[in-house]
Amino acid sequence: MGQKVSPNVLRLGIVRDWEDTWYAEKDQYVKWLDQDIKIREGVLKLLKDAAVSKIKIERTNSNITLIIRTARPAIVLGQEGKNVSNIATAVQKIAKDRNLKVEVKVIEVKNPDADRTLVARWIGEQITNRASFRTVQKLAIRKALKAGVKGIKTSVSGRLGGVEMARTEGYIEGSVPLSTLRADIDYALYEAPTTYGQIGVKVWINHGEVIGGQSQRVSEKAPMNNDRRFNNKNNNRGGRK
C-alpha cells in the first residue's frame, strides 16, 4: 500500500538542503535539536505579522546564525534594529547562554505569491475570516501562476463551510510531478482555526527542474489549460492524513 511523504523530506540531499546546518556530538545533538525547535517557535511568535517564510539555523558552540526569509523585512528588523535585539535575547534565553553570539540575517521574499508557506498561510487566514474556501484557492492559484511557477496544487481539509462531515477539496493547475526527484517542489502545511474546528491547508508549488545544480525557479509562466479539481470526502479533521 502506498504511503505519502513530504516532498521537502524526499528531496533532501538531492535538490533540497537541510534547514539546520551544524554538527554536534551524540550527547549534544538532542539538546541542540530541541533548542532549534523552540527557537523557531519563539521567533515566529515574535514575528507573527512579518510574513516569515522560512528560518534557517547555522550554529557552532559559541555562535548561532538565523537566516530569516520574509516578505516584510522592515518588520523583522524593527525600528533601529529593535526587533533584532529582541530576537537575540530570546535565542540566548532559550539556549540558556547569555554569552552566545547571535547573528540575524534577513532575506527578502520578493515574490510572496510564489512562496509555499506564504500562500498556505494566506489561504488559511482568508478561511479563518470566513471567505469561501473555493474562491481563495482559485485566487491563490491564479496569483502563483502569474508569478511564474510551473505548477501549483492546493488542498483544504476539515469541516468546510461548517458542515457536519469533514472532507477534502482542492485544485491543481500546471505540472506538479511529486515523484520526479529533480523537480524543485515546495510543500507547506498551515492549520487555520475556525469556529467549527481546524481547517488544514496544504500547498505544493513546482518551480521547475533542477538541472546541473541550477534551479529554474520562476523562469516561465505555467500553462493555464491544465485545470483539474479533486474532491475526496473523508472523516478526518484538519489537514493531516
UniProtKB/Swiss-Prot annotation:
Part of the 30S ribosomal subunit. Forms a tight complex with proteins S10 and S14. Residues 215-241 are annotated as: Disordered. SUPFAM superfamilies: Prokaryotic type KH domain (KH-domain type II), Ribosomal protein S3 C-terminal domain. CDD domains: KH-II_30S_S3. Belongs to the universal ribosomal protein uS3 family. The keyword NADP does not apply. Keywords: Ribonucleoprotein, Ribosomal protein, RNA-binding, rRNA-binding. InterPro entries: KH_dom, KH_dom-like_a/b, KH_dom_type_2, KH_sf_prok-type, Ribosomal_S3_C_sf, Ribosomal_uS3_bac-typ, Ribosomal_uS3_C, Ribosomal_uS3_CS. Residues 232-241 have a biased composition (Low complexity). This is Small ribosomal subunit protein uS3. GO terms for molecular function: mRNA binding; rRNA binding; structural constituent of ribosome. Binds the lower part of the 30S subunit head. Binds mRNA in the 70S ribosome, positioning it for translation. One of its GO terms (cellular component) is cytosolic small ribosomal subunit. It holds the Pfam family KH_2. The lineage of its organism: Bacteria, Bacillati, Mycoplasmatota, Mollicutes, Entomoplasmatales. Residues 39-108 form the KH type-2 domain. GO terms for biological process: translation.
